[in-house]
Amino acid sequence: MSRLQFQLQTRDGRARRGRLTFPRGTVETPAFMPVGTYGSVKGILPDDVRALGAEIILGNTFHLYLRPGLDIIADHGGLHGFCRWDGPILTDSGGFQVFSLAHRRKITEQGVTFASPTDGARVFLGPEESMKIQKVLDSDVVMIFDECTPYPATEDVARRSMELSLRWAQRSRNAHDELGNDAALFGIVQGGVHTDLRSRSAEALQAIGFDGYAVGGLAVGEPEHERNAMLDHLDPELPSDRPRYLMGVGRPEDLVEGVARGVDMFDCVMPTRNARNGHYFTSFGTVRIRNSQYARDMDPIEPGCGCVACTGGYTRSYLRHLDRCNEMLAPMLGTLHNLFYYEKLMADIRAAIEAGTFLAFRESFYAARGAVAPPL
């Protein structure tokens, strides 16, 4: 029996307002999950992550398995004790990271053999191995092991990939149950940009039975309109009483469009990675702090923002100086700002759904950027 309870509280159009309840805490949805690839959200403390409004974070099974290894994490009682985060954690299965090693991997029915990016050693990962690793990590949400369908892919390639992922999904389900793991287990819908394959994947996953359903294989190069079309197609085909997770999709616009199409959960490295590259998100667009126009700019990143970078009086001029000097404080302040922006965006979205004003919120979101909302 899964430790996860999901309550769908209200809707506004297709946008959903809900709550995930775990023994380690509750998560208000729609939710954005900061990514802690190696067991930390880069550059900031777990208490900072919590203070920014995050209630759940993501850990990376693939990288944690390779380094530091399961024995060391087990010494700490699992990933929560290792990284000092006491709230819920979702761990991915490693499938996407294996996908990214395109020239150093071999896929068979059993799983994937690849050269470790850390030391070149031969490593095998399959559904059973992924479930065992995630059991040791003791995450609150476990993802099945799947193959991320590349883009572009012919329908035949996408079909064979999707069918392999379905067989791995059943093996993941079996292994998860045999391990006696009471963490939530999420299935992952694949099928590329082919609606019939997405439908087959969603139907087959529901026949197996999972605690939540993720949409994978997007944000891999496809145009935005194709991604939105897949979400439009899947919205009525996924069970309404289970959480829905759009994997790895993370521009602010993508979050708004995902929510508009029934998505409950998101993750992406974008707010943290972009902060390290001097790109700061605001309600009016992106501040690229390395541009010369900010050399003597006395404003904070976003006037009126409640993050510590903006309320602390740090000017764009100062942040540009820190960035140009490669000072550690620049990405730290940028990360604090970007994650604050993302978590506040999600809080504002939740409030708009509760008030029945999400569509108006969506229009104003784009208007502030000088843009027009894409069609729904």
Swiss-Prot record:
Under the heading InterPro entries, the entry gives: ArchSynthase1/Queuine_TRR, TGT, TGT-like_sf, tRNA_ribo_trans-like
Tell me where on the tree of life, at the top rank, the source sits.
Bacteria
Cite the EC number.
2.4.2.29
Protein residues bound to substrate: D92, S93, G94, G95, F96, D146, Q190, G217
Disulfide linkages recorded for this protein, renumbered to the chain, are none
Q: Which cofactor does it need?
A: Zn(2+)
Catalytic center residues: D92, D267
Q: Give the co-factor note.
A: Binds 1 zinc ion per subunit.
What are the start and end residues of every segment in region (RNA binding)? 248-254, 272-276
| GO molecular function terms noted in the UniProt entry | metal ion binding; tRNA-guanosine(34) queuine transglycosylase activity
**Which reaction equations make up its catalytic activity?**
7-aminomethyl-7-carbaguanine + guanosine(34) in tRNA = 7-aminomethyl-7-carbaguanosine(34) in tRNA + guanine
Gene Ontology cellular-component terms for this entry are: cytosol
GO process terms (BP):
queuosine biosynthetic process; tRNA wobble guanine modification; tRNA-guanine transglycosylation
Task: Please state the pathway this protein functions in, per its UniProt record.
Answer: tRNA modification; tRNA-queuosine biosynthesis
Residues binding Zn(2+) are: C305, C307, C310, H337
Could you list this entry's UniProt keywords, alphabetically sorted. Answer: Glycosyltransferase, Metal-binding, Queuosine biosynthesis, Transferase, tRNA processing, Zinc
**Pfam families named in the record:** TGT
Annotated family: Belongs to the queuine tRNA-ribosyltransferase family.
Q: Which HAMAP family match?
A: Q_tRNA_Tgt (MF_00168)
Q: Provide the function of this protein.
A: Catalyzes the base-exchange of a guanine (G) residue with the queuine precursor 7-aminomethyl-7-deazaguanine (PreQ1) at position 34 (anticodon wobble position) in tRNAs with GU(N) anticodons (tRNA-Asp, -Asn, -His and -Tyr). Catalysis occurs through a double-displacement mechanism. The nucleophile active site attacks the C1' of nucleotide 34 to detach the guanine base from the RNA, forming a covalent enzyme-RNA intermediate. The proton acceptor active site deprotonates the incoming PreQ1, allowing a nucleophilic attack on the C1' of the ribose to form the product.
Q: Which NCBIfam families match?
A: Q_tRNA_tgt, tgt_general
User: Assembly state and interactors?
Assistant: Homodimer. Within each dimer, one monomer is responsible for RNA recognition and catalysis, while the other monomer binds to the replacement base PreQ1.
- Name by which UniProt lists this protein: Queuine tRNA-ribosyltransferase
Which organism is this protein's natural source? Answer: Stenotrophomonas maltophilia (strain K279a)
